[in-house]
Amino acid sequence: MQSSLKPAGSGHLQLLVCFLLLYSRPGSCSDINAHDGQGQVGSEQLWTFQGLIASVFQYLQLIFHQIVPEGMFWADDIAYELMTKKVEHLSRLHPQYPCRKDMKAVSPTANAGVRSKQEEKLQLLSPQKSPTVKVNRDRCFTTKVIPKATKQEATHPTKGFFGPFPTVGLNLVAD
C-alpha cells in the first residue's frame, strides 16, 4: 500500500514538493497546501512517496546526462549553484512556451566531443539506458552551465565528481 506524502512542518520537504510541482505542471509554490501536501491546481492527483522519489531521480538523471557530455565536474559549491539556477529557471518557464523560438526541442547533447569516456560515465549513472537524452516536448528547457574543467580534465579526469564508485555497474535509480 502506498502512502501519500504529507509535509508535516518540514520546510525542506515542502520546497522539494514545490520544485517537482513547478517542473511537472503549471502553477506556483503558493498553489501548495501545506496541510495535505497537494496543490490547488489539479488536486485530484496524489503524490505518493514512490512517485515523488522516482520523479526526483529521473530529473537528477536528466541533469547528469546534460552535464557529463560537456565534461563538467562538480566541486565545492558548483552543485548547489547549478540546482539553484535550475529551480529559478523552472519557476520562470511559461507552460505554453517550453521550447526555443523556433519551437524545436532543445538538444542536451549538442557536442559530439570525446564520447567513449563520457558514454562510460553515463552508463555508470544509468547502465540500462542509452547515453542519449530524449527531451519531452512539453518539458524542454535549456540550462546554462559554466564549464570548470579544461579539455585535458574532461578527457583524463584526475579528481572531481566522477571518482571511483563502490557501486560500479549497479543500477542506482530507484524504481
Swiss-Prot record:
Pfam families: RESP18 (PF14948). Pituitary, hypothalamus and pancreas. Highest levels are found in somatotrophes, mammotrophes, and gonadotrophes, and lower levels are found in corticotrophs and thyrotropes. Residues 1-29 form the signal peptide. One of its GO terms (cellular component) is Golgi apparatus. It is found in: Endoplasmic reticulum; Golgi apparatus; Cytoplasmic vesicle, Secretory vesicle lumen. Induction: Up-regulated by high levels of glucose. InterPro entries: RESP18 (IPR024833), RESP18_dom (IPR029403). Keywords: Cytoplasmic vesicle, Endoplasmic reticulum, Golgi apparatus, Signal. GO terms for biological process: in utero embryonic development. It comes from the Eukaryota. Its main location: endoplasmic reticulum. May play an important regulatory role in corticotrophs. Belongs to the RESP18 family. This is Regulated endocrine-specific protein 18. It comes from Mus musculus. The lineage of its organism: Eukaryota, Metazoa, Chordata, Craniata, Vertebrata.
